[in-house]
Amino acid sequence: MAKEKFNRTKPHVNIGTIGHVDHGKTTLSAAISAVLSLKGLAEMKDYDNIDNAPEEKERGITIATSHIEYETENRHYAHVDCPGHADYVKNMITGAAQMDGAILVVSAADGPMPQTREHILLSRQVGVPHIVVFLNKQDMVDDQELLELVEMEVRELLSAYEFPGDDTPIIAGSALRALKKAKAGNVGEWGEKVLKLMAEVDAYIPTPKRDTEKTFLMPVEDVFSIAGRGTVVTGRIERGVVKVGDEVEIVGIRATQKTTVTGVEMFRKELEKGEAGDNVGVLLRGTKKEEVERGMVLCKPGSITPHKKFEGEIYVLSKEEGGRHTPFFTNYRPQFYVRTTDVTGSITLPEGVEMVMPGDNVKITVELISPVALELGTKFAIREGGRTVGAGVVSNIIE
């Protein structure tokens, strides 16, 4: 198939398959690409091709992930699939593969299993906003009532983790049959079910806001004083747009300050505006150099607030990944690296959890010694003497 076929004018959405081991996530990923390839919307990817996922490093954590891309009539998709359960945990916590939505694969023959629940919980914790369900292996279930029972169980499980279980689209089919048919060059009735699934994904998972459309936020990396012009803070704009004349707040570490942008520069040239992804210098009116430091953020007033206490979902690096060799306990005090700076904080483990071993994932409560701009979904690294020992994401703000 000619590469030029991918038309970048379609809206782009990131999705992935989640679910219990051996329920058919990778087979479904292969089936989607195979069925869509018959319509000239994807390149056929073989199961083995997806299953032998290359290992990637994200903040020192080894994650095996497969990326495939395909289109529907309406959208362009980047799709991630992970071979192992641990890879999903790491992927979702580090945000290595940000998902705008997920396809939860549940075997109709087995119903929801422990990792089904765990992946739904993780999706809730790390902020995967929407889930569509594929009941796989429908060909192995003769009893329609059993199928309905599994569907009911899945809806209840989704609702238990605050997803709209009753309104979630659930499509039954057989990924393996669809894949075999598509390889033989036919869509067939099983392929139609895969197309139906993708139509639901198109309709149910909203197109995400682009980074430039979000509220302005820039982590401060450095601060300079320019004679006769004032204070310049530099950094990479995380989201949104900033222009001369904008009111901004400086948040984190100390009391929040308000100021006005009097200039935006990139590579020593004046810009009308800076936008998400740009490395810029922002000139601030009446702000003194000593009032701003690395680790603060510049943002649209009122859009983010400083916090000291939060809950997070973390993955603790294994010894092999260069992490700790020993467990840690409540009152462990590492540094939390948020955006551009380290802040010391103490960890409280959940009731009933005595210790955390390298390689575990766990929910923790953190109290920082100074406030940092935080919101749901903010990513952080846990460090000890400059060495990363864990990665996490803010799942709840306490104060």
Swiss-Prot record:
One of its GO terms (molecular function) is GTP binding. GTP hydrolase that promotes the GTP-dependent binding of aminoacyl-tRNA to the A-site of ribosomes during protein biosynthesis. Residues 136-139 are annotated as: G4. Its EC number is 3.6.5.3. Residues 81-84 are annotated as: G3. Belongs to the TRAFAC class translation factor GTPase superfamily. Classic translation factor GTPase family. EF-Tu/EF-1A subfamily. Its main location: cytoplasm. It is found in: Cytoplasm. Residues 10-209 form the tr-type G domain. Mg(2+) binds at residue 26. HAMAP family: EF_Tu_B. One of its GO terms (cellular component) is cytosol. NCBIfam families: EF-Tu, PRK00049.1, PRK12735.1, PRK12736.1, small_GTP. GTP binds at residues 19-26, 81-85, 136-139. Residues 174-176 are annotated as: G5. It catalyses: GTP + H2O = GDP + phosphate + H(+). Gene3D superfamilies: P-loop containing nucleotide triphosphate hydrolases, Translation factors. Keywords: Cytoplasm, Elongation factor, GTP-binding, Hydrolase, Magnesium, Metal-binding, Nucleotide-binding, Protein biosynthesis. This is Elongation factor Tu.
